[in-house]
UniProtKB/Swiss-Prot annotation:
Biased composition (Basic and acidic residues): 62-73
PTM annotation (Phosphoserine): residues: 116-117
Superkingdom as given in the UniProt entry: Eukaryota
Record gene name: GAL
Protein name per UniProt: Galanin peptides
């Protein structure tokens, strides 16, 4: 009986030593993977602000939502670049139509084509 208990004790000690050396047993619980908080910390508020979980109900706002862009006032300098480009294109087109109607573009057709610097050097 003493021989059996000694063999059992030896096998338990061997198993404990092997599991500790192989890294199968860890003394502290390790946290792994991404959580919403860690993603928000690393990616910034814009990445997390657009996140909605399945538990969100329509019509209710959360604390983490971004400020809506409806607060922008007309004529403010916060306009996006494509909107400014569209407005600039429309203004240039209307200016072109006004010059064409006034006859200012007819005089430009009578002028010779502008020569490049290479053409001037050759002649």
């Amino acid at each position: 009986m003493a021989r059996g208990s000694a063999l059992l004790l030896a096998s338990l000690l061997l198993a404990a030593a092997l599991s500790a050396s192989a890294g199968l047993w860890s003394p502290a619980k390790e946290k792994r993977g991404w959580t919403l908080n860690s993603a928000g910390y690393l990616l910034g508020p814009h990445a997390v602000g657009n996140h909605r979980s399945f538990s969100d109900k329509n019509g209710l706002t959360s604390k983490r939502e971004l400020r809506p862009e409806d607060d922008m006032k007309p004529g403010s300098f916060d306009r996006s670049i494509p909107e400014n480009n569209i407005m600039r294109t429309i203004i240039e087109f209307l200016s072109f139509l006004h010059l064409k109607e006034a006859g200012a573009l007819d005089r430009l057709l009578d002028l010779p084509a502008a020569a490049s610097s290479e053409d001037i050097e050759r002649s």
